């Protein structure tokens, strides 16, 4: 069934990527932005899984794992840290966090890099392999699906730049609010380490998947 409906899934996945990306570009709510970006990334590993190639399936699983690390960290940043301190989720009310929360800004930056699929993160490995699998099956839709890389970089850079930089800190924050607590720091650091560690050395994940994925492809063919 996955072979018979592959191209339908491809079309649905590409439409989802484009629609979610444009929706993300227009939102000003930080949690909505992260949620819409999650939909776009989910569509990427959907079409990677339906590419019925070893690279595509391995990449989709790796991207799903990476997405779990990065999105969890970003939601903690948005809801567990920023919202708790300001009681607002609107990006337009944030600016200058680097001045009063430098440690948070660094951890948030690394997670933002992961969300945009920057090299040396597990997200890059997953996206590259997923899209490579799509290119092998249908190059035209592979090109359209690759626009997710451009869009994710655009809305992630906008979000980070608007929140962390942008002049003096917002009136919604006080200068003495303090940086991240020890609990918040440990939670974010775990996600950052996993994202970067497996981005630099993804072999434990990919080698562990290779036999099962190869067996699956062999049975399908």
Curated annotation (Swiss-Prot):
Keywords, comma-separated and alphabetical: Electron transport, Membrane, Mitochondrion, NAD, Respiratory chain, Translocase, Transmembrane, Transmembrane helix, Transport, Ubiquinone
Membrane topology note: Multi-pass membrane protein
Transmembrane segments: 5-25, 34-54, 61-81, 100-120, 140-160, 185-205
Primary subcellular site in the record, as a coarse category: mitochondrion
Residues making up the signal peptide according to the UniProt record: none
Enzyme Commission code: 7.1.1.2
EC category name: translocase
Catalytic reactions on record: a ubiquinone + NADH + 5 H(+)(in) = a ubiquinol + NAD(+) + 4 H(+)(out)
One MF annotation (Gene Ontology) recorded for this entry: NADH dehydrogenase (ubiquinone) activity
Annotated localization: Mitochondrion membrane
Family annotation (InterPro entries): NADH_UbQ_OxRdtase (IPR003918), ND/Mrp_TM (IPR001750)
Gene Ontology cellular-component terms listed: mitochondrial membrane
Any single biological process term in GO: ATP synthesis coupled electron transport
PANTHER family: NADH-UBIQUINONE OXIDOREDUCTASE CHAIN 4 (PTHR43507:SF1)
Family: Belongs to the complex I subunit 4 family.
Its biological purpose: Core subunit of the mitochondrial membrane respiratory chain NADH dehydrogenase (Complex I) that is believed to belong to the minimal assembly required for catalysis. Complex I functions in the transfer of electrons from NADH to the respiratory chain. The immediate electron acceptor for the enzyme is believed to be ubiquinone.
Name of the protein this chain belongs to: NADH-ubiquinone oxidoreductase chain 4
Species per Swiss-Prot/TrEMBL record: Emericella nidulans (Aspergillus nidulans)
Lineage: Eukaryota, Fungi, Dikarya, Ascomycota, Pezizomycotina
């Amino acid at each position: 069934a996955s072979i018979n409906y592959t191209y339908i899934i491809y079309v649905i996945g590409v439409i989802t990527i484009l629609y979610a990306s444009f929706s993300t570009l227009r939102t000003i709510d930080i949690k909505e932005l992260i949620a819409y970006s999650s939909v776009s990334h989910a569509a990427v590993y959907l079409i990677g899984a339906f590419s019925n190639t070893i690279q595509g399936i391995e990449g989709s699983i790796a991207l799903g794992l990476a997405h779990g690390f990065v999105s969890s960290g970003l939601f903690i940043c948005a809801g567990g840290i920023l919202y708790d301190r300001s009681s607002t989720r609107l990006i337009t009310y944030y600016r200058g966090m680097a001045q009063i929360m430098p440690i948070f800004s660094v951890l948030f930056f690394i997670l933002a890099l992961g969300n945009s699929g920057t090299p040396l993160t597990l997200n890059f490995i997953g996206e590259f392999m997923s899209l490579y699998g799509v290119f092998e099956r249908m190059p035209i839709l592979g090109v359209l699906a690759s626009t997710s890389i451009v869009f994710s970089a655009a809305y992630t850079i906008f979000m980070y730049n608007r929140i962390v930089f942008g002049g003096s800190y917002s009136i919604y924050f006080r200068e003495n609010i303090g940086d991240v607590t020890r609990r918040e720091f440990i939670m974010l650091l775990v996600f950052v380490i996993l994202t970067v560690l497996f981005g630099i050395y993804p072999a434990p994940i990919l080698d562990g998947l290779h036999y099962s994925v190869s067996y699956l492809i062999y049975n399908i063919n």
